[in-house]
């Protein structure tokens, strides 16, 4: 039998970077077109987030240069706040590092993998370092070539130069050389990604230089810069035991009571007193041997009758005092079991819904501006639903835009977004697709959806978008999100229905008018023979009569539409 030491001779600890190097497909680097789009997406996402957090109207320029067969140089430049020199290796060379991953805050990137994953993909396909040029607007520009040490999950600068900055340039430019990718103008390519990004971010000016040198500009159509999202405290209904235990070890609060009030939303002194009772009640219920009676107590607790449950046990005040004492000890001394008790009690308690002030939707006006500016439709409308929560305590918000006709070609298109970021892949498994296809579009005057000149835009906003995978291209089918998407679509579709109904009525009126006008000459000729009146005079009379009748009908129709809109 082999010895244990021999069996474990090949045992090796794998770094996060090494894991993702071997599993790049998990980050979206699968397929030649998709890999290039993913790489551009990660860089553009970083640029937009940085500009908005600094209150700067984003200017993003993307250049794709073909160096050989399936071999490109990708350049992304922005006018953001720049990156301090000491953070360059962390931003571009360390997985699970960033300004967002550890915060309960809405952002385009959430996992701290994005741009460093792009650097790694470029490195493993071309062997080249990523060139970074950046300045915070001070007197120097930093030029650095960054590589990732996959064994240590660390970035390293293989070459660095400093240049004077007499004009005070501020921003970041990155150049990545990448192989085994392909540029195509498909609906999964870079052009399409930037087009959809421009629609959801009308405050951004975006430029693309394609491999053939063609310049495409998506101009800024709104001067409004979204306010930076606000970090939100975790809600009691959305936390795990590990969350409470880990936060307790890190907090600066001096008691468990102060910790709970200060680190979580919707917890006050009064709520902590209530929590004490629930924990005490749960401790007492677990001492009951009769399972049927135990279930009855749990049911009463779920209904909020905590005091009645406590009074059912002799000496319950002693247990309440023990729990109250726990609330006054230092948080760092909180045990795992005590954290479990707190989270279990949370499940039975009632809390106000989490605050939603930290969510930053695009907004109805800006959705309409984005759709009009890029698609040039004949009709556009947008709906932003009120914030809701899923999984008991995670806030989210759904927005929908509909664009119809005009320069939109025949054929239904669904534009999917999460926190303003286009989702181009894995549409079949996405809750947005499922919700859109569940709608009976015929009710809204769309008889053949697949041939209609219709674009449906759906944006899901949340501090934690429930993606189906690390590639972040598909949103999981969560009931609360699914229902909100359906409600938003139906609201917008009713407005489209009103527009199409009016359009159909007008077309019918035009047809009727042409029918009447067609017979005017013949009628005028016959009446002229019968009455002796001039034919021209009779013809003019009938034309004026038809015009007055249809004009009054149009006035009545406009009035009816106004009443319907205000109803």
Swiss-Prot record:
GO cellular component: cytosol; small ribosomal subunit
GO biological process assignments: DNA topological change
Enzyme class: isomerase
Domain of life: Archaea
Pfam families per record: HATPase_c, Topo-VIb_trans
UniProtKB keywords: ATP-binding, DNA-binding, Isomerase, Nucleotide-binding, Topoisomerase
Listed EC numbers: 5.6.2.2
GO terms assigned for molecular function: ATP binding; DNA binding; DNA topoisomerase type II (double strand cut, ATP-hydrolyzing) activity
Cited InterPro entries: HATPase_C_sf (IPR036890), Ribosomal_Su5_D2-typ_SF (IPR020568), Ribsml_uS5_D2-typ_fold_subgr (IPR014721), TopoVI_B (IPR005734), TopoVI_B_transducer (IPR015320)
Signal sequence region: none
Catalyses which reaction(s): ATP-dependent breakage, passage and rejoining of double-stranded DNA
Gene3D superfamilies per record: 1.10.8.50, 3.30.230.10, Histidine kinase-like ATPase, C-terminal domain
Binding site for ATP: 46, 78, 99-100, 109-116, 472
Record PANTHER family: DNA TOPOISOMERASE 6 SUBUNIT B
Family from the record: Belongs to the TOP6B family.
Chain's role: Relaxes both positive and negative superturns and exhibits a strong decatenase activity.
Subunit organization: Homodimer. Heterotetramer of two Top6A and two Top6B chains.
Name of the featured protein: Type 2 DNA topoisomerase 6 subunit B
Source lineage: Archaea, Methanobacteriati, Methanobacteriota, Thermococci, Thermococcales
């Amino acid at each position: 039998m082999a010895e244990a030491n021999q069996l474990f001779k090949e045992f090796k600890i794998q770094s996060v970077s090494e894991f993702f190097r071997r599993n790049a497909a998990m980050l979206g680097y699968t397929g030649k077109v998709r890999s290039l789009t993913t790489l551009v997406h990660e860089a553009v996402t970083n640029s937009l987030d940085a500009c908005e957090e600094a209150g700067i109207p984003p200017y993003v320029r993307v250049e794709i240069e073909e160096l050989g067969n399936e071999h490109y140089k990708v350049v992304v430049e922005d006018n953001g706040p720049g990156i301090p020199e000491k953070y360059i290796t962390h931003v571009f060379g360390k997985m699970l590092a960033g300004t967002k991953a550890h915060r309960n805050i809405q952002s385009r990137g959430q996992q701290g993998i994005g741009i460093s994953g792009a650097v790694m993909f470029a490195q493993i396909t071309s062997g080249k370092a990523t060139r970074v040029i950046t300045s915070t607007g001070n007197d120097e520009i930093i030029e650095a070539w960054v590589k990732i040490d996959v064994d240590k999950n660390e970035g390293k600068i293989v070459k660095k130069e400093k240049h004077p900055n007499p004009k005070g340039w501020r921003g970041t430019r990155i150049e990545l050389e990448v192989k085994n990718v392909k540029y195509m103008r498909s609906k999964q390519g870079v052009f399409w990604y930037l087009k959809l990004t421009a629609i959801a971010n009308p405050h951004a000016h975006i430029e693309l230089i394609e491999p053939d040198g063609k310049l495409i500009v998506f101009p800024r159509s709104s001067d409004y810069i979204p306010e930076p999202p606000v970090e939100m405290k975790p809600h009691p209904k959305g936390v795990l035991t590990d969350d409470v235990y880990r936060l307790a070890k890190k907090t600066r609060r001096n008691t468990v009571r102060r910790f709970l009030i200060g680190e979580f939303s919707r917890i006050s002194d009064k709520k902590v007193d209530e929590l004490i009772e629930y924990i005490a009640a749960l401790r007492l219920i677990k001492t009951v041997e009769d399972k049927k009676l135990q279930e009855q107590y749990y049911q009463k607790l779920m209904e909020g009758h905590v005091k009645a449950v406590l009074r059912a046990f002799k000496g319950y005040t002693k247990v309440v005092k023990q729990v109250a004492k726990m609330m006054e000890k230092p948080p760092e001394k909180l045990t795992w079991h005590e954290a479990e008790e707190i989270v279990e009690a949370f499940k039975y308690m009632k809390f106000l819904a989490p605050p939603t002030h930290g969510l930053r939707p695009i907004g109805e006006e800006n959705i309409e501006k984005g759709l009009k500016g890029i698609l040039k439709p004949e009709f556009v409308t947008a709906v932003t639903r009120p914030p809701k929560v899923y999984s008991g305590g995670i806030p989210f918000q759904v927005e929908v835009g509909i664009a119809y006709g005009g320069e939109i070609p025949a054929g239904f298109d669904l534009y999917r977004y999460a926190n303003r970021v286009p989702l181009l892949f894995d549409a079949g498994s996405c809750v947005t697709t499922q919700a859109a296809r569940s709608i009976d579009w015929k009710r809204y005057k769309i008889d053949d959806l697949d041939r209609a000149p219709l674009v449906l835009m759906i944006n899901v906003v949340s501090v934690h978008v429930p993606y189906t995978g690390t590639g972040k291209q598909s949103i999981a089918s969560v009931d609360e999100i699914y229902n909100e998407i359906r409600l938003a679509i139906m609201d917008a579709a009713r407005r489209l229905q009103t527009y199409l109904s009016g359009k159909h009525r007008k077309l019918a009126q035009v047809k009727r008018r042409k029918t009447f006008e067609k017979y005017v000459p013949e009628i005028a000729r016959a009446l002229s023979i019968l009455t002796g009146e001039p034919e021209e005079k009779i013809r003019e009379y009938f034309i004026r009569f038809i015009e007055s009748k249809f004009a009054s009908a149009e006035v009545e129709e406009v009035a009816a539409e106004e009443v319907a809109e205000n109803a």
